[in-house]
Amino acid sequence: MPRRTPAIALALVVCAALAAVAFARTKPRYLPEHRARYLPEYTASGELILPKNSIWREWVFVGAPLTPNALNGGKAGFPEYHNVYMEPGSYEIFKKTGEFPDGTIMFKELQLTLSGENPDGSRTEPSGRGYFPGPFNGADVTVKDTKRYAATGGWGFYNFNHHEPKAPTATLKPREECAYCHIANAKKDEVWTQFYRLLDK
């Protein structure tokens, strides 16, 4: 009976080599693919359309500053958590270039604090005394477009209500309502990167 061991061994080596080549050409599923960017959409009259299906909650979370009323004489301009998300495709470009590309959407979802039990507006929960997130309360959105918003340094500012539900569309805010403060005080390109460590490079 002829010996087949060398032939079988050779076949196994060839199969293993082919499998290795195929594996090398296939990206593992856990590696992130290049993201298709979610770009801003506008109505025919130029209003910004609220991103669909609350998709911003799946975007890159960059920070949540808090300015409660109780610490601002009851008159805080934004008496909520500012839960800020950045569109992922734009974030990938920012990581590589250090610049916010045209089409960048920064979505600030406002969230009230739970009612306070103390003069400073804080309350006590199992984790300790502090401020705790409550109901959502509308949203502010900024969009980068150096041509469309040339008059305000390349960014457009929008409000989708300071209550729920969020408005389906929003009109561009005048320079004196939002842009002037960002231009004067934000650390990088009208973005408060000094409060968003993920972006503070």
PLM feature segments, named:
Residues 32-99:
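N-terminal secretory signal peptides
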Residues 9-19:
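Bacterial N-terminal signal peptides
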Residues 27-34, 45, 55-58, 68, ...:
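Sequence context surrounding c-type heme c attachment/ligation sites in exported
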Residues 6, 16, 48, 65, ...:
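Compositionally biased, intrinsically disordered low-complexity regions
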Residues 22-26:
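Boundary at the C-terminal end of the N-terminal hydrophobic targeting segment
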Residues 1-11:
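Bacterial N-terminal signal peptides that target proteins for export
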